[in-house]
């Protein structure tokens, strides 16, 4: 990140993403999962009972199991997870585009932490920090916990910076246009028109929605708006929505991505999948969708499977974030 004089640069933008292990070894994965799955926003359960289950059953099993999956998607050239690599590059590009702002990034879980980056920004002279959670759709399990951590950090500071936040952008025109254009460009590269474009969002326990989490509604709004942008141009393509990454025995938001893909496979359909809830490619897209779901889809009789990459560190993503920020806070020139 660029270094700025505190005398002239007092506003900063902090991009926040979910997080990642430092490496793909068991110890690193276990440490990351423990922090992530210990967040009461993520797992709503009896804290004493959950702590026992987490430490004695889940962490030993999942940490070891995930070594192979993380190793499969790891960016070995830069020794970083894809999520970290793309988020870092995204922040760098946005930093270059915003001359009058310090732009940095942090992870809610793992490194670099929100606490360390707030300190770094203050050291550079930032007296106002604009928090930008890179989750288009709001959920207490993602967006809210970013702000929980921000205010936990602030509660320990004697000199607190002013904090502002960028709203969830699930229905923002710049987001909808960018996702729509991304799908169009991908479809142009294909040899034939697919039968279906499936919008796969990360899942959520249904009881969270029943308690008032708006995530389900936000996902459907994104899906509907993008569909409206595309359906006239592609009348022969079905656009559908599903939820992936179910964890545990509870009922999650439906329909499940696995179930929908198996239905399409039995009908020998060709499918294009996009995961518009993820700002950067990660385990859930590069392994779960691109490998596991694809293999199962083909095995069950599916014709063709194509995954659209996340926006990652693309110029389109940088421009989209710039426009959203400018729309919300009227960037100083």
From Swiss-Prot:
It catalyses: heme b + 2 H(+) = protoporphyrin IX + Fe(2+). Fe cation binds at residues 202, 284. Disulfide bonds: none annotated. Its EC number is 4.98.1.1. GO terms for cellular component: cytoplasm. Gene3D superfamilies: 3.40.50.1400. This is Ferrochelatase. Pathway: Porphyrin-containing compound metabolism; protoheme biosynthesis; protoheme from protoporphyrin-IX: step 1/1. Belongs to the ferrochelatase family. Its main location: cytoplasm. The keyword Cytoplasm applies. GO terms for biological process: heme biosynthetic process. The gene is hemH. HAMAP family: Ferrochelatase. The keyword Ribosomal protein does not apply. Keywords: Cytoplasm, Heme biosynthesis, Iron, Lyase, Metal-binding, Porphyrin biosynthesis. It is an enzyme of class 4 (lyase). Catalyzes the ferrous insertion into protoporphyrin IX. It is found in: Cytoplasm. One of its GO terms (molecular function) is metal ion binding.
């Amino acid at each position: 990140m660029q270094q700025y004089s505190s005398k002239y640069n007092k506003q900063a933008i902090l991009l926040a993403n979910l997080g990642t292990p430092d490496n793909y070894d068991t110890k690193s994965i276990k440490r990351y999962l423990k922090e992530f799955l210990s967040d009461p926003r993520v797992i709503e359960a009896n804290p004493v009972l959950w702590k026992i289950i987490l430490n004695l059953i889940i962490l030993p099993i999942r940490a070891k199991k995930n070594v192979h999956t993380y190793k499969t998607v790891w960016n070995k050239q830069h020794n970083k997870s894809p999520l970290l690599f793309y988020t870092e590059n995204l922040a760098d590009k946005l930093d270059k585009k915003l001359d009058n702002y310090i732009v940095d990034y942090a992870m809610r879980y793992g490194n670099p932490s929100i606490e360390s980056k707030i300190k770094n920004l203050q050291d550079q002279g930032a007296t106002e920090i604009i928090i930008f959670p890179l989750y288009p759709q709001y959920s207490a399990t993602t967006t809210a916990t970013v702000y929980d951590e921000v205010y936990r950090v602030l509660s320990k500071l004697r000199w607190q910076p002013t904090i502002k936040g960028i709203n969830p952008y699930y229905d923002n025109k710049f987001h909808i246009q960018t996702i729509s254009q991304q799908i169009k460009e991908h479809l142009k590269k294909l040899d034939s028109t697919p039968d279906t474009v499936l919008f796969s969002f990360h899942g959520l326990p249904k009881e969270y929605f029943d308690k008032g989490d708006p995530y389900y509604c936000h996902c459907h709004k994104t899906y509907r708006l993008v569909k409206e942008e595309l359906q006239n141009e592609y009348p022969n393509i079905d656009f559908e929505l599903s939820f992936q990454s179910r964890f545990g025995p509870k009922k999650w938001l439906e329909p499940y991505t696995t179930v929908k893909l198996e239905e399409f496979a039995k009908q020998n359909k060709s499918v294009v999948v996009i995961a518009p809830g993820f700002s950067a490619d990660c385990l859930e897209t590069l392994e779960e969708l691109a490998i596991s779901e694809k293999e199962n889809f083909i095995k069950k009789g599916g014709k063709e499977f194509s995954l659209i990459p996340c926006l990652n560190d693309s110029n389109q993503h940088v421009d989209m974030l710039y426009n959203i920020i400018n729309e919300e806070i009227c960037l100083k020139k």
